[in-house]
Amino acid sequence: MDPAVLQAITALVVDRVDWTNVDLLLGIEAMGLPLTAPLSVETGVPLVIARKRSYGLEGEVEIDQSTGYSKGAMYLNDLKEGERVAIVDDVLSTGGTLEAVIEGVRRANASVTEIIAVIEKGEGLKRLRDLYPDIRIQSLVRLVMDGEAIVLLDE
């Protein structure tokens, strides 16, 4: 990823999230690592990653992740009861991954307060907003496929 693009994404997310309502950043493996690490450094908010393999640690939460594109398990570690979590994801399409992660965070007795996706395509964001009206869910870029063309939409 180009450093200038990563800096721009970091700056946009820093400006759009209510950091007074966040105790922990959560990224989703693998693109969650380069997206959330600079955010953690910039904001001073600790970071955890939803991983695709188990570490078998005490308190680990297994997530049954099923999307329109893949199926499998993910694992959450280091969530503390009562923590307020901001999830950062690279692409939000169907919302299946984020829905599974939200439910995993809740099983750990923590809460998701913010979700920000770098790219939104499809109806996943709307679906998640309908399912979770208490969570602030947004994207930086919204794309629509128009036949063979990709169309960038304004809010």
Name the predicted role of every residue range.
Residues 1-88, 92-155:
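PRPP-associated nucleotide enzymes
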